[in-house]
Amino acid sequence: MKENQIKLGEKVIVSDPCYSDVDGWFNNQINNMRPGMYDTQVVKSDEGDWGDRIASLTVLHEIIKSPIWEDIGSVAVDSGQMSICCMTSYRNDEVAKDLPWLTEKGDPFGDHPIRPTKETGEGWYVKMCDRTLREEQWGTYESGVVSSTGYGDGMYKLEVSKMDDMVHGIRVTFLQSEEEREDELLEEGYYD
């Protein structure tokens, strides 16, 4: 497996890793993903005094070179993070048990009073926080990727790339340039 590459199965979830309800309106399940190896990518944007922020998170099947993106709606964020991963690994504490800590401190919550409540999936969630709280602001594990989300909480644009009725790419956009936003509004008919 190449660096920053993950293996996805046919069932994938696009969600803020804090959400324990996989069937909630705030995330998106994709049940027709082309199984295989996916390259992961984040695009960063220099946001002045805010520093470098992640503008988008993308997974793309390794055989696809020129995706055509289709807007399929949006996904919600409440913890300032977004994950794209196999349904089998989402909030799976058994998967998290073997994941290394990536920050120097290890568990970012320690005994802190705001530590997430002890519930199923908390071990996985804390390991995802470990990936987004480091300088890179994102990270992968065998069957998923997680990143911080631009300026944090909100609703973000979700796009897929399809071929032969199978999804072979997912992109979540957190930040857009002013020009991209104007082009989008023009396409939606907000300008004459």
Could you say what each language-model-derived stretch is?
Residues 1-192:
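Intrinsically disordered, low-complexity acidic regions enriched in Pro/Ser/Thr
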